[in-house]
C-alpha cells in the first residue's frame, strides 16, 4: 500500500485475493407443476406462492368438510333432545343396533345414518346430560367458522391475505438481517 495508491485498485485486489467478496453460481432446478425446470429466483418465488395457494385451499377444504360433518352431527343431537324419551324407548325396544338405527332413520325421527350412528354410539348418561344451550352455542360458532372457511375459498383476495399472514409469521419467526449483498453478474 502506498500513500498515493488508487483506492479502487486496492479494494479490487482485496476482493480478488481474499474472501472479502465471494461469487458462486447457482443451478436451481425445481419441479414446477411436476416438470423439472431450471428457474431463477423470481420463478422460485412464484412457484412457492402457487404451491401455498394449493396448500391453503386443500387445508381449508378439509377443515370445511370436517366442520360441515360436525354441524350435521350437532343438528342431529339438538333434534334428538326434543324427542329424547321416544329415542330411549326405541333403543330399549330394539333387538339389535341395526333395528335401532333403522328406527331412528325412519319416521317420525328421520335422522340421517350419520346422526343415527352418533346417537347410538353415545352412552345413556351422555344422552341425558346433553345441554341444548351448549349444543346450540357450539353449532352457532361452527356455522360462523363454516362461513369464514367458505369465504376463504370463494374470495381470492381473502386467500391471498391468509397467505400473506402465514408468510409474515414465518418471516417474524426466522428473520435475520442480511449480512451480505446479493448482486447479479452477467459474466
Q: What name fits each language-model region?
A:
Residues 1-187:
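C-terminal interaction appendages of subunits in large macromolecular complexes
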Amino acid at each position: 500500500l502506498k500513500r498515493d495508491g488508487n483506492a479502487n485498485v486496492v479494494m479490487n485486489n482485496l476482493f480478488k485475493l481474499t474472501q472479502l467478496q465471494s461469487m458462486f453460481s447457482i443451478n436451481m432446478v425445481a419441479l414446477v407443476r411436476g416438470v423439472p425446470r431450471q428457474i431463477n429466483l423470481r420463478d422460485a418465488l412464484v412457484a412457492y406462492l402457487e404451491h401455498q395457494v394449493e396448500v391453503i385451499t386443500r387445508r381449508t377444504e378439509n377443515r370445511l368438510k370436517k366442520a360441515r360433518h360436525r354441524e350435521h352431527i350437532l343438528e342431529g343431537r339438538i333434534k334428538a333432545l326434543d324427542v329424547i324419551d321416544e329415542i330411549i324407548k326405541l333403543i330399549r325396544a330394539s333387538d339389535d343396533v341395526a333395528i335401532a338405527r333403522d328406527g331412528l332413520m325412519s319416521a317420525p325421527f328421520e335422522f340421517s345414518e350419520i346422526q343415527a350412528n352418533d346417537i347410538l354410539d353415545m352412552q345413556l348418561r351422555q344422552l341425558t346430560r346433553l345441554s341444548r344451550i351448549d349444543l346450540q352455542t357450539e353449532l352457532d360458532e361452527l356455522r360462523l367458522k363454516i362461513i369464514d372457511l367458505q369465504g376463504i375459498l370463494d374470495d381470492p383476495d381473502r386467500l391471498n391475505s391468509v397467505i400473506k399472514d402465514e408468510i409474515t409469521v414465518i418471516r417474524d419467526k426466522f428473520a435475520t438481517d442480511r449480512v451480505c449483498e446479493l448482486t447479479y453478474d452477467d459474466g
